[in-house]
């Protein structure tokens, strides 16, 4: 019996009795009984059941990554501080676009957030069609590219934030966070949010690769 069939019925018809040896038939013999035997259906668990659960989890993680990516972009993009004192020639002002590294950070995390938003329809397709291979393969490829971009931007910004906090005596770079405390706190928060986004992208890559595994 095939396990994928919903059920089958077996009909058994008894053979009529043979005629009397003397040549006389049995006139009053009842019609042959019909015996119907029904086999119980054996339902097979859907192959894509666990993959659908993975796809739903993928969708939720993407929403969280969008939130952290937008937070990193917004916090860094609005980072600015002006000290309440100034001299005749200088005004002490710090803004994210004073450093090309922070500008690259905003650009990269903005791209990552935009990509994650555009990837949501593909994630929904994976929920509707959990056995589809092409959408998951595309997600793995683009997730990897965006993850690399996000890690590069976060790492570069983290190096600048470290110098802002600690300085570098060999290069005569003084720490500025004692004066620009709010500026340093905002940039540090943005870098942490960006690293969280990169970690979620890494997890999404592993999740998609696991979902491509065949039963």
UniProtKB/Swiss-Prot annotation:
Source domain of life is Eukaryota
Q: Where are the transmembrane segments?
A: 56-76, 102-122, 137-157, 190-210
The alphabetical list of record keywords is: Cell membrane, Cell wall biogenesis/degradation, Membrane, Transmembrane, Transmembrane helix
| InterPro entries membership | CASP/CASPL, CASP_dom, CASPL
Coiled-coil intervals: none
Biological process terms from the Gene Ontology for this record are: cell wall modification; cell-cell junction assembly
Q: Name one Pfam family in it.
A: CASP_dom
Those parts of the protein on the Extracellular side are 77-101, 158-189
Q: Where in the cell is it found?
A: Cell membrane
Region Disordered: list its residue ranges.
1-26
- Cytoplasmic membrane side: 1-55, 123-136, 211-215
Can the keyword Lipid metabolism be found in this entry's annotation? no
Keyword Cell wall biogenesis/degradation listed: yes
Q: Which GO terms describe its cellular component?
A: Casparian strip; plasma membrane
Membrane topology reported for the UniProt record: Multi-pass membrane protein
Q: How does it assemble?
A: Homodimer and heterodimers.
Q: Which family does it belong to?
A: Belongs to the Casparian strip membrane proteins (CASP) family.
Q: What does the protein in this record do?
A: Regulates membrane-cell wall junctions and localized cell wall deposition. Required for establishment of the Casparian strip membrane domain (CSD) and the subsequent formation of Casparian strips, a cell wall modification of the root endodermis that determines an apoplastic barrier between the intraorganismal apoplasm and the extraorganismal apoplasm and prevents lateral diffusion.
Q: What is this protein called?
A: Casparian strip membrane protein 3
């Amino acid at each position: 019996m095939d396990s994928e069939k919903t059920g089958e019925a077996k009909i058994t018809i008894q053979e009529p009795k043979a005629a009397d040896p003397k040549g006389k038939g049995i006139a009053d013999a009842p019609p042959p009984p019909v015996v119907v035997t029904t086999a119980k259906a054996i339902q097979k668990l859907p192959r894509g059941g666990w993959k659908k659960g993975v796809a739903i989890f993928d969708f939720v993680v993407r929403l969280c990554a969008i939130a952290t990516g937008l937070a990193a972009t917004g916090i860094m993009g609005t980072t600015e501080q002006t000290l309440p004192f100034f001299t005749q020639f200088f005004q002490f002002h710090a803004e994210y676009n004073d450093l090309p590294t922070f500008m690259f950070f905003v650009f990269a995390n903005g791209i990552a957030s935009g990509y994650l938003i555009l990837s949501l329809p593909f994630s929904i397709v994976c929920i509707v069609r959990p056995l589809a291979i092409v959408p998951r393969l595309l997600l793995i490829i683009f997730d990897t590219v965006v993850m690399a971009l996000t890690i590069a931007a976060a790492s570069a910004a983290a190096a600048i934030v470290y110098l802002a906090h600690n300085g570098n005596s060999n290069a005569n770079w003084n720490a500025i966070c004692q004066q620009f405390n709010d500026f340093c706190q905002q940039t540090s928060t943005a870098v942490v949010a960006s690293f969280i986004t990169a970690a979620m992208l890494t997890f999404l890559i592993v999740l998609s690769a696991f979902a491509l595994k065949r039963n």
